[in-house]
Regions:
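Short beta-strand to alpha-helix junction loop
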Residues: 5-13, 36-46, 71, 87-107, ...
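Active-site substrate-recognition segment that forms the wall
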Residues: 77, 121-131, 140-272
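Short loop/edge segments at beta-strand edges and connector loops
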Residues: 65, 117-119, 250
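Helical element adjacent to the flavin cofactor pocket in flavoenzyme catalytic cores
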Residues: 45-57, 77-145
Length: 317
C-alpha cells in the first residue's frame, strides 16, 4: 500500500465490513490482521520508516522483532532465526474473494439486478460521442451510462472510441492447498516481503500467491512458477509443506490489470456516459468496495467521501 491509495484502501475496508455485517456474508473472512516479514535488516528498516509516514493517515501497525513475530504467528518458529523482524497491521482483513463475489451476486439478484452470465460483450455503440448501447453476442442493451470494469481487457472495448487506457496484464499465480488433515494451521496471513509472496489461511485451506509475469495474455502455465510457489511454502512453513499432499494443490492464474503509476482509473472518460473502473493491479479486492463507492458518487455528481484526484480516469482518457 502506498500513501496515495491508503485512504482508498481504508475506505474500502470499512465498506466491506458494512456489507458483510448487513447481509451476513460468509467468505472465510478473518479479522486477525496481516503481517509482513523481512529476511534482511535493510528492507526491514526501510519498511519500518515507510509505515511511520502512513501512520499520519490513520494506518495502524506495530513493528516487531523476530521473536515477537513468532509470538503472533507460532508457525514461523521454524524460520525465526532467518527473520530480521515483522510489521503487523491489526486492522487488515482477509478472505476468499471468489466466495465474497458469490455472496454479492446473491444480494444483487435479490435486489433486482440482472447479471448476464456466459455473455460476451462485443462493443459499445455511441451516438454523437454519447453512449447509446452495449452489443453482446446475445442481445443489444440500450444504455445511457456504461461502466467498463473489464480489467486487463478494457482496451478491447475502447477500440472504436479512439481512447486508450495504459493498462497492461501482469500474470500472477496462486496455489491453494487443503489443510483439513492437519491438527493445527497458521491463523494469520503472512506476506514475505523479500520474495513477494503471500500465505493466506482460508478456512481449511492455505493459499500461496505470488510471482509477476509480463507476458501479455499468454495463458501457458510455466512449471517453474508453480515450483517456485512450492519452494516458497517450504521456505516459510517447512513443517506444513512436509505434511501436506502437495500434488493435490489447486492452481490458479489471472491477469492483473496494471497501470503505469500503480493507481487505478476510476470515473468518467471524455465520452459522455462512459465510465471506467480498472487498473487496480494486485490490489483489486483491497480497493474494490471503495472504488465502487467513489465511482457511484462521481456518476451521481456527488462529492466523494475521499480525495479522488490521484485515481481519476481523466488523467489518461
Amino acid at each position: 500500500m502506498c500513501i496515495r491509495d491508503s485512504k482508498l484502501a481504508q475506505h474500502s475496508l470499512e465498506l466491506t465490513k458494512q456489507i458483510r455485517e448487513k447481509y451476513s456474508f460468509n467468505y472465510d473472512h478473518s479479522s486477525l490482521g496481516t503481517m509482513k516479514i523481512f529476511r534482511d535488516e535493510s528492507s526491514f528498516d526501510k519498511a519500518s520508516r515507510e509505515v511511520e509516514r502512513l501512520s499520519n493517515l490513520g494506518l495502524s501497525f506495530k513493528v516487531l522483532t523476530n521473536q515477537e513475530a513468532v509470538e503472533q504467528e507460532p508457525f514461523l518458529s521454524d524460520v525465526s532465526e532467518k527473520l530480521s523482524g515483522g510489521i503487523i497491521f491489526p486492522d487488515d482483513e482477509s478472505g476468499d474473494a471468489y466466495k465474497f463475489c458469490k455472496e454479492l451476486e446473491k444480494v444483487i439478484r435479490e435486489k433486482g439486478g440482472r447479471i448476464h452470465v456466459n455473455t460476451e460483450v462485443k462493443k459499445i455503440l455511441f451516438n454523437k460521442r454519447k453512449v447509446n448501447s452495449v452489443v453482446t453476442d446475445r442481445v443489444e442493451i440500450k444504455a445511457s451510462r456504461v461502466v467498463l470494469t473489464s480489467g486487463s481487457w478494457t482496451n478491447n472495448l475502447l477500440k472504436n472510441t479512439r481512447l486508450n487506457l495504459p493498462v497492461k496484464p501482469v500474470k500472477g499465480y496462486s496455489l491453494t492447498l487443503d489443510t483439513s488433515i492437519l491438527n493445527d494451521t497458521p491463523k494469520m496471513p503472512i506476506i514475505d516481503e523479500g520474495i513477494h509472496t503471500a500465505f493466506t489461511p482460508l478456512g481449511y485451506s492455505l493459499r500461496v500467491a505470488g510471482t509477476a509475469e509480463f507476458a501479455g495474455f499468454n495463458d501457458d502455465i510455466h512449471q517453474k512458477r508453480i515450483d517456485y510457489l512450492y519452494k516458497t511454502l517450504e521456505s516459510i512453513y517447512p513443517t506444513i509443506s512436509a505434511n501436506l499432499d502437495l500434488d493435490k494443490g489447486a492452481l490458479w492464474y489471472g491477469f492483473r490489470p496494471m497501470s503505469p503509476d500503480g493507481m487505478p482509473y476510476i470515473g468518467p472518460t471524455k465520452l459522455s456516459g462512459l465510465f471506467v473502473n480498472t487498473g487496480h493491479g494486485h490490489s483489486g479486492w483491497t480497493l474494490a468496495m471503495g472504488s465502487g463507492d467513489v465511482l457511484a458518487d462521481l456518476m451521481l455528481k456527488k462529492q466523494p467521501k475521499i480525495e479522488v484526484k490521484p485515481f481519476l480516469a481523466s488523467r489518461a482518457v
